[in-house]
């Protein structure tokens, strides 16, 4: 049961376009176990929902079909709509706003076309963003090359507050 929020079956009720953002091949995540549970809970609340699994690659290379099979298993790969994010396709990005740093935030259009966005992943210490987890699924996970490059710039990383476990004043975290 979730803490401090309604269950996914309640959150998904009445939502048609649901996006589940998940980590790519560079992150250890037991999606073969967790994704079926997430999908079942979503469909309890909205059986006919159109669900897209978006693999958050950031600037990493695309996740291969073999890696998708290893991560999710053959049933999910065969049955579900899975899209591998590509930050280098500007036609797939949409501008959202200006970030506190002054950089522009452009994200994968699928996020803006969704009624509900769910992020699957771990939260753990991160050496310059403070911590990994939910917000990193968005930035850098599903952002444009330009947005990620600004967020991960030498200037931002050089900040003494851009370090493990620090969120307050961390310029990388504050843009996320």
Residue ranges, per PLM feature:
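Glycine-rich phosphate/diphosphate-binding loops that line cofactor/substrate pockets in enzymes
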Residues: 3-19, 43-49
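Short coil/turn connectors at secondary-structure junctions
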Residues: 14-17, 47-51, 77-79, 112-116, ...
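Short alpha-helical segments and helix-capping/turn motifs at coil-helix boundaries
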Residues: 3-6, 37-40, 100-110, 174
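Histidine-anchored nucleotide/phosphate-binding helix
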Residues: 27-47
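Extended, low-polarity segments enriched in aliphatic/aromatic residues
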Residues: 138-176
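An acidic, phosphate/nucleotide-engaging active-site surface
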Residues: 63-132
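A short, gly/pro- and small-residue-rich
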Residues: 41, 127-148
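Short glycine-rich or small-residue beta-strand-to-loop segments that form or flank ligand, phosphate
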Residues: 17-28, 52-58
């Amino acid at each position: 049961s979730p803490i401090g929020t309604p269950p996914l079956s309640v959150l998904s009720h009445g939502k048609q376009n649901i996006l589940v953002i998940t980590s790519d091949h560079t992150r250890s995540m037991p999606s073969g176990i967790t994704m079926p549970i997430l999908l079942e809970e979503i469909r309890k609340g909205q059986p006919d929902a159109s669900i897209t699994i978006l693999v958050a690659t950031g600037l990493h290379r695309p996740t291969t079909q073999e890696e998708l099979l290893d991560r999710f298993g053959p049933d999910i790969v065969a049955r579900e709509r899975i899209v591998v994010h590509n930050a280098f396709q500007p036609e797939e990005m949409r501008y959202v706003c200006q970030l506190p740093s002054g950089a522009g935030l452009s994200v994968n259009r699928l996020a803006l076309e969704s009624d509900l966005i769910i992020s699957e992943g771990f939260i753990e210490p991160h050496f310059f963003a403070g911590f990994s987890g939910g917000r990193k699924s968005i930035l850098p996970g599903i952002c444009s090359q330009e947005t990620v490059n600004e967020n991960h710039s030498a200037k931002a990383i050089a900040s003494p507050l851009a370090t493990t476990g620090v969120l307050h004043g961390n310029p990388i975290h504050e843009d996320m």
